Amino acid sequence: MGMNQQRLTQVILVPVVSEKSNVLAEKCNQMTFKVLANATKPEIKAAVELLFGVQVASVTTVTTKGKTKRFGRILGRRSDVKKAYVSLVDGQELDLEAAAAAADKE
């Protein structure tokens, strides 16, 4: 299966910013992203390498099921979320703020 660049640019939705993701970034050189529900690990790896220009060591994914929430008498449901924990090769560093600034200039 060939991966086209248009698909790769859509795979990563948004970086996850939380206490856990910050600790992983500092101690384990891992970045956390929300990704498309049907994204595969090879696609995620290729997308990170293409968009941020870093080498990826491994990708771990987890799908979090959406919670059921009540709005008065109406039952609603939050969407399922797929997260990817991307481990970078030693010596590689990913600065999301610099990457976002560079993307804004284009």
Swiss-Prot record:
The species this protein was found in: Neisseria gonorrhoeae (strain ATCC 700825 / FA 1090)
Q: How does it assemble?
A: Part of the 50S ribosomal subunit. Contacts protein L29, and trigger factor when it is bound to the ribosome.
Q: Check the record and name the SUPFAM superfamilies matching this protein.
A: Ribosomal proteins S24e, L23 and L15e
Q: Which GO terms describe its molecular function?
A: rRNA binding; structural constituent of ribosome
Print the keywords alphabetically. Answer: Ribonucleoprotein, Ribosomal protein, RNA-binding, rRNA-binding
Q: Which GO terms describe its biological process?
A: translation
Please name one Pfam family that this protein belongs to: Ribosomal_L23
Cited InterPro entries: Nucleotide-bd_a/b_plait_sf, Ribosomal_uL23-like, Ribosomal_uL23/eL15/eS24_sf
Question: Domain of life, per the record?
Answer: Bacteria
Q: What does this protein do?
A: One of the early assembly proteins it binds 23S rRNA. One of the proteins that surrounds the polypeptide exit tunnel on the outside of the ribosome. Forms the main docking site for trigger factor binding to the ribosome.
Q: Name one GO cellular component term.
A: ribosome
Protein family: Belongs to the universal ribosomal protein uL23 family.
Could you identify this protein by its name?
Large ribosomal subunit protein uL23
